[in-house]
């Protein structure tokens, strides 16, 4: 189950008389390798940095090339959903007080310290061409970063062996209309939250047939048979871009044959069908291991 990630920047300045103007509209950025790794171990969206280099972004970078200023002042947070385009998003606006970011700026980044970058980009003009913008000494600079998560549109498949018997597994994104509510809002918070911080849960279902798993906009339509405990597997391994979860169902209350399982995680809501049903009674503990993966979206 792999979630694709993307980000965009927007720049606006406010003059002393209160009037505002957009000086660089929405443009894509490069999520760095350091940023992809940071998702597996900690928060990543607490600081914004601006600087003066025109060097092209590359995945191995970890900081701005020529940093001038940084801000951890968060003006606004919002989350949203674009069902037709298959993503949900966080928008966080960082404010640089008048004079803090004054000068000629050509690069920008967001990250989790005053220097370490989750992403880096060159500032571009309205045509998308790298440019230099000028912020005057009496102007306030607001930089908005939009972080997107795209849910997978293709099913995964696997074979599960339990007590010598084989079961066919189909995995799929679930209830994508709630992704921005159940996970993205948690990411926003103080900005310090990460995949390690939230452990939402796991549910088992019984009855029905694999087709009852349903499409990506709904939860499984089988009968619910109880909730379990979701915990993390091994510690994050650098450059793996994945975390493992283990769903546990103790002897009670889940005592029915299991035909589907739903996982709710920071990286999305996912479900899987199990065919044939896995038998379970009040003497069994059932556990299932899954991996959530993430990747840089190709822009």
Regions found by a protein language model. Give the residues of each.
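Small cysteine-rich, disulfide-bonded extracellular modules of the LU/uPAR three-finger superfamily
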Residues: 1-105, 112-299
């Amino acid at each position: 189950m792999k979630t694709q990630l993307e980000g965009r920047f927007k720049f606006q300045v406010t003059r002393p008389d209160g009037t505002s103007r957009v000086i660089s509209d929405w443009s894509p950025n490069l999520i760095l390798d350091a940023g992809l790794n940071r998702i597996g171990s900690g928060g990543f969206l607490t600081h914004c940095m601006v600087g003066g280099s025109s060097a092209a972004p590359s995945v191995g970078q970890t900081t701005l090339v020529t940093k001038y200023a940084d801000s951890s002042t968060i003006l606004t947070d919002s989350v949203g959903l674009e069902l037709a385009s298959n993503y949900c998003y966080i928008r966080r606006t960082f404010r640089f007080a008048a004079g803090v970011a004054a000068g000629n700026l050509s690069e920008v980044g967001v990250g989790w310290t005053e220097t370490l970058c989750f992403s880096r980009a060159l500032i571009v003009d309205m045509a998308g061409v790298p440019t230099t913008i000028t912020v005057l000494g009496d102007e306030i600079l607001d930089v908005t970063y939009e972080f997107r998560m795209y849910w997978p549109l293709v099913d995964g498949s696997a074979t599960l062996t339990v007590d010598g018997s084989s079961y066919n597994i189909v995995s799929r994104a679930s209830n994508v209309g709630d992704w921005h509510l159940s996970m993205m809002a948690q990411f926003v918070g103080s900005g310090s939250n990460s995949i390690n911080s939230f452990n939402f849960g796991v549910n088992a279902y019984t009855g029905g047939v694999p087709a009852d798993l349903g499409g990506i906009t709904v939860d499984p339509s089988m009968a619910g048979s109880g909730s379990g405990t979701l915990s993390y597997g091994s510690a994050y391994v650098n450059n793996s871009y994945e975390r493992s979860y283990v769903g546990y169902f103790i002897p009670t209350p889940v005592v029915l044959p299991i035909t589907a399982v739903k996982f709710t995680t920071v990286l999305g809501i996912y479900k899987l069908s199990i065919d044939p049903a896995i038998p379970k009674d009040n003497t069994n503990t059932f556990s299932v291991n899954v991996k959530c993966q993430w990747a840089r979206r190709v822009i």
